[in-house]
Every structure is written in C-alpha cells, then in structure tokens.
Design a protein with these regions (language model features):
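Hydrophobic alpha-helical transmembrane bundles that constitute the permease/transmembrane domains
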Residues: 11, 23-31, 223-234, 286-289, ...
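ABC-type nucleotide-binding domain
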Residues: 15, 69-72, 84-123, 488-738
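Membrane-integrated ABC transporters
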Residues: 1-32, 36-223, 228, 232, ...
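Short intracellular "coupling" helices and adjacent cytoplasmic loop segments at the cytosolic face
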Residues: 44-51, 58-65, 154-155, 159-162, ...
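Juxtamembrane helix-loop junctions of ABC transporter transmembrane domains
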Residues: 28-44, 216, 225-272, 276, ...
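Helix-loop-helix
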Residues: 310-327, 331, 337-338, 394-467, ...
C-alpha cells in the first residue's frame, strides 16, 4: 500500500475528483428509484396530485372537512385558507387552472401557511370522513365502496348533508377521528389525494393534463439525473484510466531505471524472466487495481450504505430482508476469499516460471535441437503451462460461479420483497411504487457486495504484484554512487590494481585474492589462465560491474569508487565475452558507443575491427539492418561489430573480454596489428584463451584459482611460469615456442 500511496500522490487532485464524482454518480443512481416510486405512487395511482393539501377549495369543502377535525386542527386548517373575492385579479388568475371557481365561494391556501400541519390535518380529516361514511353505511344498510365509490361521489350531495352533520353531536365523529389519529400518515395522504381529485374536479381542473404534466416532469428529472450519472461515470472512467496509466508509466520507468543501475550482484538475485514479468505483467496488475479500484472501491461502499439508507426510508418493516441478504452475501464473500485468495497469490509466481521456461527454450533452441531434447523441453513447458492453466482455471471458475450465485440471491430477495411487500400493500401500509423502489435499492446493495467481492478477489494478486515491484525498487544497490564524486581528468593515466580481493555475495572463499598489477597507457596487458581462473571476474571489477571486497582499483591515481559510474564507464571501451548487438542498423549499433560520432569515425572503427570488408558487401552498407541480438550476422561478424562499437569511443581504457575467440587466425592477426596503432595512447586489457592472441603483449598476467601465478612477457613467462608454459605447449608448435 505504501508503494501505491507514493505513486498516487502526484495524482491526488484527480483521485479527489474521482471520489467526488463517484459520490455524485451514486447519488444519481440512488435518486432514480425514488423518482420511479413517485411516478407510480403519485403520477399513476394518485393522478399526479402531489399537494399535501389542496391549493384551492370550495368553502363548503372546508366546512365539511373541519367537522372531522379536532378544534386545534380545525383552527389551523381554517386560518390557512383565505377567501377568493369574486371579480378580483386573484380569481381571474386562478380561473385559468380552476375553471369553475367563479361559480362558487372558493378559498385559497395562504403562502405563509404551515403546509405540513395543514396537510396532516387534511389527510386525517379525509380518512375520518371516509371511515364515517363506511361505518354510517354499514349501520343504515347503504354500504359505500371506499375503494372506488369515493372517486365517483357527487360533491353537491355531500354538501347538502353538511347542515345535518353540523347538528349531530361531536361524539358522533369521535370514533372516526380517533381511527384517523391512529392510522399511518401514508394512508391519510393517499385518501387525502383522492379527495383532492374530487375537489379539483369540482373546480374544473383538467386532471388528465395534471397527471400527464406530473409524469412528464418526473420523467424528465429521471432522464436528467440519468445523464448526469452517465457523465459522472464517463469522467470517473477517464480520470481513473489517466491515473492508472500514469502510475503504470512512472512505475515501469522507475523499475527500468532501477534495473539499469543494477550490478551483476543484483542480476544474480533476480532472473531476467522475473524482471521482465515485474516490469510488464506485475505493473499491469497494479494498473488494473488502480483503474478498477478507483471506480469500485469507492463506489461500492457508497452505493451499499446509500442503498440501505434509502431503502429504510421507504420501509423499515422490510429491513430484515436486507439484513438477511447482507449476512448471506458476507458469508459468500468470506468463502470466496478463503478459497480463491491463495490461488491468486500464486499466479504471478507461476507466470514467472512459464516466462523463464519459455525464455530458456527460445534462447537455447539450437542447443535443444542439437541434443534432440525437444520432447524434454516440451514436457518442461507443458508442466509450467499446465500449472498456470490449472490455477487460472480454478480462479476463473470461482469468479464465474460468483455471478450466478449473486443473481440467485438477488432473485430470491426480489421474490421475498414482492411477497412481503404485496401483503403490506394489501394492508395499505405500503405503496406499489415504494415496493418497486425497495427492490431496486436491494439490487443496488447486492451489486455493491458483488463489486466488493470482485475487489477482494483482485486485490491479493495485485498486492503480490505490487510487492514484487517494490522488491525491485527497494533493492539496495551493492554498487553506489559516491556522495562527492571526484573528476577523472583528461590525461590518459595508468590503471592499477592494489592488493585486490573479491568474493561473490554468499561465497565462502575469495574468487580473486591479492591481485596487484599496473597497466600503463600505450601498452597491452593480457590475462590468461584455465577456465574458472577469474579472468572475466577481474575484468568486471574495472567498470564496477562488481565492487572489490578488498584492496582498490585506481585509474589515473584515483580510486574508481570515488568516480561517478557514468564518468568511469565513459572512459572505458568495453567488449563483452558474448557479443551483443541491438535491433537497428550497423550505424546505430556502432554509434551506441558514441552518439555524435561522424561517418569518418564510424568507418575508422569498422576498418580497425576488420569489419569494413563484409559491411561494404552489404546492399546498404552501414545502414544495413541488424536483427534483435544480431541474429542476422555470423558470430565473427557480430564480434567485430562489437569491437568497432568500443573503438569508436576512443576511450583511454579498452577492455576485450575474450573478444577474439570467434575470429579466424588471419583476421585475429590483422585486427591486433590495427589495434596496436589505433590504441597507441590507451590502456589495453585483453582476456584470451589463445596464446597467439596475446604473445606480443607488453605484460601477460597468468591467473590460477583467483591468484596471480605469473607476470611478464611471453618469453619471460615461458621460462618462469609452468602454468603459462603448459598452456603455450598445448597451443603452439615447438618452433613457435623456440
């Protein structure tokens, strides 16, 4: 997590923007079921009547309703309405909506009225009146259908009985009023809306137009909010992609730069296949985690918590269904995590293994064919492939079974809500629109848990990848830059080994012991010895591919550890034991040693390296293409181009690590003669297996088991060094030895 925080810090503003947009998107998604509920409850069932109390009433309606209110409510209700005078501007304005207002004494709801209190009183009175009608009809044998009959009532007949009702004792209505007091406010508001439609119909209101207007307005609100939600989702996706790709780019760049600073010690710790996987696949996993995490990690909790809050606002009585669903989903997520997480953690290790086997097989294809071991390599690859496939198959099956289980839970919860909600609707304790919204909120809660499950499944693999990337980035370099590097200077000085010893990291014994010699400018110092004597190891200490564990190496009298690595290596022309070319052209490969080299310098280096002949025969000369790794040129040609690349630097020190082994004797001799002139002012170090390559060197150092056993010229060593003479006798004729 520390790694992610570090890389997300530059994108803090975008991350904050994503979180805010996710809140906005969640609020849009949570608002839509509410609007759908309003359309069903108010727009369809109540005909678009959404007023808590009618805006305009017939005075007779006020007289009728106040009979079914207590004194306090009646006072509040009457004070809330003011008479509309005939012929007034107010009446003219209201007549546009209430066409019959001029034919009756009307009252209008005051702007400063307490709408909530008036609405409560109105709803209770409407419910009490309906209860009274029902009870009165039962007593007189003239039953009133309160479900549909109320909507067809003739208000003039109701107003006609007002005087009779006013003569009745107040106690006559007390039972109906008490029933209304005890009833849920939702029932009162529903009955109130039914009576509002009657009063509006009496006033000449176009109820169909009112209903259509309400539905259209709510529909447009839904459309607008849906578009806002889509816009927020698009912006979140854009920002999340920008953040994740930016983090991945920086992380990949940092890993690459870190690997470039590795010495051979670090490369011994990390395999090439592993470093490739960490730079590509592991970074991609982290990128996916950031991209999906920004969208799901923040969105899922907001939706889950918001869905629960909005659902409880619709109905508390159904909350046990949500609790049951959440418990089942939590159990499912826990089971999935315990089953899938260990497998996800092993995926990256198995990917590493497959890459390693693939790389070894491809790079060693000729050897595999030479020993007819194709079947063995196929078996190795099949095992690595099968292990990865089996683990991938298991994790994919776990993930694929998650969705059907979630859908089953979702459908069962929907059925349960419809069953329980249906009974609540029948008992008038819940509205159809509220049940529909409740189902939507429950689906959103379940989908939130599905997203959380996906996150928990994705996080372990991504965190393993992040740890693997961090392992590379936090690897302590064995070769460090000096805090205050000194400058080497322009003079071509000598190279000196002063009692140098070297031991590989976990080795028990030194590979090199007490090595001391001086290589002077204008002279060739050669190294020879049996295989494993430490020749290449010694050479690798000069450009600081490894650091000495004892003694010191000096260049121009300065300890190379006090020089910056760039300055040190800029002063060395290095030809490795295994020639390596890069994809491009011959010219680009030669200029790899010196980017600003002109044509004459390139041609001079090629001429000295004895590469001019075969380069000139190519159709495009120095612009001829080189395949990856130099696979389209021979071993000798590749080695000569590698030598030319080092020579073009015109460095004060040249290192040839067994760089003439692929050359024939004739080319070897010509190259050495040309090299003597080309490097006349430089320190030349040659590691060789052939005595003929180094017999003219001013100084030959013989190594055996990491120690110097002989030092001198060819003739001197033949007399004084048995090890050198043994090597020489195995390669040279008696005449040459003489």
């Amino acid at each position: 997590m520390k790694l992610l925080k570090t890389y997300l810090k530059p994108f803090a503003a975008l991350v904050l923007a994503c979180i805010l947009l996710l809140f906005g998107q969640a609020m849009c998604d949570l608002t839509l079921p509410n609007l759908m509920s309003d359309i069903v409850n108010t727009g369809i069932q109540l005909g678009g009547v959404d007023e808590a109390a009618p805006a305009v009433l017939n005075q007779q309606a006020v007289d009728l309703l106040t009979l079914f209110m207590n004194d306090a409510e009646a006072g509040t209700f009457k004070n809330a309405y003011t008479p509309v005078e005939h012929g007034s501007d107010e009446e003219t304005k209201l007549a546009k909506t209430y066409e019959n207002i001029k034919d009756m004494d009307a009252v209008a709801l005051s702007e400063d009225a307490d709408v909530q209190a008036v609405g409560d009183a109105y709803g209770k009175a409407a419910y009490a009146f309906m209860t009274f009608l029902k009870d009165y009809g039962a007593q007189t044998g003239q039953a009133v259908d309160t479900e549909s009959g109320v909507q067809d009532m003739d208000m003039r007949q109701l107003y006609a009985v007002i005087p009779m009702l006013q003569q009745m004792p107040k106690e006559t209505f007390s039972e109906a009023i008490n029933s209304a007091e005890n009833a849920q406010s939702m029932i009162g508001s529903q009955v109130g809306a039914t009576f509002t439609k009657l009063f509006y119909k009496e006033l000449g209101v176009d109820l169909d137009a009112k209903q259509m207007h309400y539905i259209v307005i709510k529909g447009l609100e839904m459309l607008g909010i849906a578009l806002l939600g889509v816009l927020a989702a698009v912006l979140v996706g854009f920002f999340a992609s920008r953040i994740s790709s930016g983090v991945a780019k920086q992380m990949r760049s940092d890993v690459f730069r870190k690997v470039e600073s590795f010495s051979n010690t670090e490369f011994d710790k990390f395999s090439t296949a592993s470093l490739i996987t960490r730079t590509t696949n592991d970074v991609t996993q982290v990128q996916m985690l950031i991209s999906m995490g920004l969208r799901l990690m923040c969105y899922a909790p907001i939706m889950g918590v918001g869905g629960i809050i909005f659902a409880l606002q619709k109905s508390v009585s159904l909350s046990w269904i949500i609790a049951l669903a959440v418990i089942v989903l939590l159990g499912l997520v826990v089971v999935l995590l315990n089953v899938a997480m260990p497998k996800f953690k092993s995926l990256q290790r198995l990917t590493d293994r497959l890459n390693l086997v693939s790389r070894e097989n491809l790079s060693g294809m000729l050897v595999v064919r030479a020993f007819t071991n194709e079947k063995f390599e196929e078996a190795r690859f099949d095992k690595a492939n099968e292990d990865l496939t089996r683990t991938n198959r298991f994790t994919q099956r776990v993930m694929s079974i998650t969705m059907p289980i979630m859908m089953l839970i979702m459908n069962l919860v929907t059925l349960l809500i419809m069953w329980v909600g249906g009974h609540a609707i029948a008992e008038s304790t819940m509205q159809v629109g509220d049940m529909m919204a409740y189902i939507q909120y429950t689906m959103q809660i379940i989908m939130s848990f599905l997203m959380i499950a996906m996150i928990f499944i994705m996080v372990p693999r991504a965190m393993v990848s992040a740890d693997r990337v961090q392992e590379v980035l936090t690897t302590e370099l064995s070769i460090k830059e000096p805090e205050n590097p000194v400058t080497l200077g322009n003079e071509s000085g000598e190279l000196r080994f002063d009692d140098v010893s070297f031991r590989y990291g976990n080795a028990e014994e030194d590979t090199l012991s007490h090595i001391s010699f001086t290589a002077k400018p204008g002279q060739t110092t050669a190294f020879i010895g049996a295989t494993g004597a430490g020749k290449s190891t010694l050479i690798n200490l000069i450009p600081r591919f490894y650091d000495v564990t004892g003694g010191a190496v000096y260049l121009n009298g300065k300890d190379i550890r006090t020089l910056s690595q760039k300055e040190l290596r800029d002063n060395i022309g290095y030809v490795p034991q295994k020639a390596m070319l890069f994809s491009g052209t011959i010219d680009s490969n030669i200029k790899y040693g010196k980017e600003d080299a002109d044509v004459n310098e390139v041609l001079a280096a090629l001429d000295c390296a004895q590469a001019t002949e075969f380069v000139s025969e190519l159709p495009n000369g120095v612009e001829s293409s080189i395949a990856q790794g130099g696979s389209n040129v021979s071993g000798g040609q590749k080695q000569r181009l590698a030598i030319a690349r080092a020579l073009v630097k015109k460095a004060p020190v040249y290192i040839f690590d067994d760089s003439f082994s692929a050359l024939d004797f004739k080319t070897d001799a010509k190259l050495r003669r040309a090299l003597t002139k080309y490097t006349e002012n430089a320190v030349v170090l040659i590691v060789a297996q052939r005595v003929s390559t180094i017999m003219n060197a001013e100084q030959i150092i013989v190594l055996d088991e990491g120690k110097i056993v002989g030092k001198g010229t060819h003739k001197e060593l033949l007399k004084t060094c048995p090890e050198y003479r043994e090597i020489a006798e195995s390669q040279l004729s008696k005449e040459e030895l003489a």
